């Protein structure tokens, strides 16, 4: 997992509440066994017209000023629905490093931390202000500083955010579940050898 300390990136807005994991990554694309390659299917039913190839010009992420965006700004209850980890894999593979919303579905929120995508919960008022600023920016950029737990835009917007200390540590050091286990490899090996 890639570590996350300070990230500056273009903001893409998704002005929709209750976006569920089936909208993030439709079920027909879940047959892959790799964790990569899902970005091409992110928001597939919204990003593409019925032919599945032509980009929908009305979809927010298809705007030219947000191409290459790495911060997603959206509304409440993002990531609801089924517990598929593929949703976070798709966001990560597409290039998103952080998602900002007033609230997240619990399982999706946990999956983000396990896969190196930083979910940031801000108040609805702060999210609304960011939407208004993003509409004026061309493109609009934010700096997300996980070390100091602050978001800034260099134009007067600055807000702090909270992240659990252990999750913050893991994100700062790029530690997923496997990497955390490997930190104790010597103890695991000693235990296994002692068991004979």
UniProtKB/Swiss-Prot annotation:
Cellular-component GO terms for this entry: 3-isopropylmalate dehydratase complex
The keyword Lyase is assigned to this record: yes
Species name: Rhodopirellula baltica (strain DSM 10527 / NCIMB 13988 / SH1)
Function of the molecule: Catalyzes the isomerization between 2-isopropylmalate and 3-isopropylmalate, via the formation of 2-isopropylmaleate.
Catalysed conversion reaction: (2R,3S)-3-isopropylmalate = (2S)-2-isopropylmalate
Record-level GO BP terms: L-leucine biosynthetic process
Enzyme class: lyase
NCBIfam families documented for this protein: leuD (TIGR00171), PRK01641.1 (NF002458)
Protein name in the entry: 3-isopropylmalate dehydratase small subunit
Involved pathway(s): Amino-acid biosynthesis; L-leucine biosynthesis; L-leucine from 3-methyl-2-oxobutanoate: step 2/4
Protein family according to the UniProt entry: Belongs to the LeuD family. LeuD type 1 subfamily.
EC number annotated for this UniProt entry: 4.2.1.33
Gene3D superfamilies in the record: Aconitase, domain 4
GO molecular function per UniProt: 3-isopropylmalate dehydratase activity
Gene: leuD
Subunit and interaction comment: Heterodimer of LeuC and LeuD.
Keywords associated with the record: Amino-acid biosynthesis, Branched-chain amino acid biosynthesis, Leucine biosynthesis, Lyase
Source domain of life: Bacteria
